[in-house]
Amino acid sequence: MAEIFETVIEQFKFSDGGAEKVKHLSKGENWPVVYILNGSKYAYVGETNNAYRRIGQHLKNEKRNSMKRVSIILGDEFNKSATLDIENKLIQHMHADRVFILQNENAGQSVRNNYYQKEAYEQTFQEIWKKLIELGLAKHNLYAIRNSEIFKYSPYKELTEEQFECVELLLKLTGRSLSTGDKENI
């Protein structure tokens, strides 16, 4: 079994005062983190290298008016690849969990490639998810979510390498047919 990195989830009111508290975290600025904004109905998942600045930006965004709380997921071992991957996984799983309606317009910046200690971050994600259940930000365990139809067919789901290659081939062939005027093979 891969190593599990220790994480902490710090929660604050989604307000100017809460943003100031984020600023004073040891990793509130200049450190990669993942965060969740939530109200009673909606949530937003993001990642940033400056939580204080990013929360400030969200406070000015009218789309986030219904948010009441910010949860910052911190880890000493976090790096940009890991936070992008965790963000992507959170969006996929929270969408399928259905506790909140996500305001995310996409699945985050997917990490298709391998990165250092990726298996350890997958184990770490499982621990993060358990903490989110304890905090009321998630309801179902990962096994139940990953076996649900909504997760399997989610629009947030990352394509497999084989699926990605098929999409690229289809786009290439369609482009070629359009450029040559061969409408029969579109």
Regions found by a protein language model. Give the residues of each.
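Charge-rich alpha-helical segments
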Residues: 30, 74-76, 80, 128-133, ...
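Conserved aromatic-histidine-acidic binding/catalytic patches
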Residues: 43, 74-82, 151-158
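Generic detector of well-ordered alpha-helical segments enriched in charged/polar residues
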Residues: 23, 52, 56, 87, ...
